């Protein structure tokens, strides 16, 4: 909708359903259409915790999906739409505009430093001490070669995180 940056307060107001027109946040006179995720979504839980400061997201059941590809398609094809996906879905030309939060762009660098507020760690667990094969797999997953490939795909790697908590 032509809006390049929102304050966190504006983002919260949009996703909780209080702000419903882009003109109220510096955009055109156009209805805001939320493209949301179901309550069971881990991405939604992360977004609510870190982007919405724990506020409950206003669901739009007609545009609700747990499929990031479908979500992007819905945002691209719907006037006034806004949604959220993992940064990895925005590599290359995803056909959508990103929105900064408090003038901080959603980039890997800003995630690594903790400047961009919406991120979380993924975890791997073993039952007890890992056996030799499992240890080799974990070493590979946490290694530089694999990390470089993951970054090319738009995923961050824990070894580059300087921020340790929100």
Residue ranges, per PLM feature:
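Exported/periplasmic ABC-transporter solute-binding proteins
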Residues: 1-166
């Amino acid at each position: 909708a032509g809006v390049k940056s929102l304050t966190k307060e504006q983002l919260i107001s949009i996703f909780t359903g209080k702000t419903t027109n882009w003109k109220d946040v510096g955009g055109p006179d156009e209805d805001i259409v939320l493209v949301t995720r179901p309550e069971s979504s881990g991405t939604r839980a992360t977004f609510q915790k870190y982007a919405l400061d724990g506020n409950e997201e206003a669901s739009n059941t007609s545009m609700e999906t747990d499929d990031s590809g479908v979500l992007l398609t819905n945002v691209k094809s719907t006037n006034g739409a806004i949604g959220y996906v993992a940064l990895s879905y925005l590599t290359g030309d995803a056909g959508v505009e990103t929105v900064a939060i408090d003038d901080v762009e959603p980039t890997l660098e800003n995630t690594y430093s903790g400047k961009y507020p919406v991120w979380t760690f993924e975890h791997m667990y073993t039952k007890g001490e890992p056996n030799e094969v499992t240890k080799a797999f974990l070493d590979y997953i946490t290694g530089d070669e694999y990390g470089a490939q993951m970054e090319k795909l738009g995923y961050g790697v824990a070894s580059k995180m300087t921020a340790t908590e929100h």
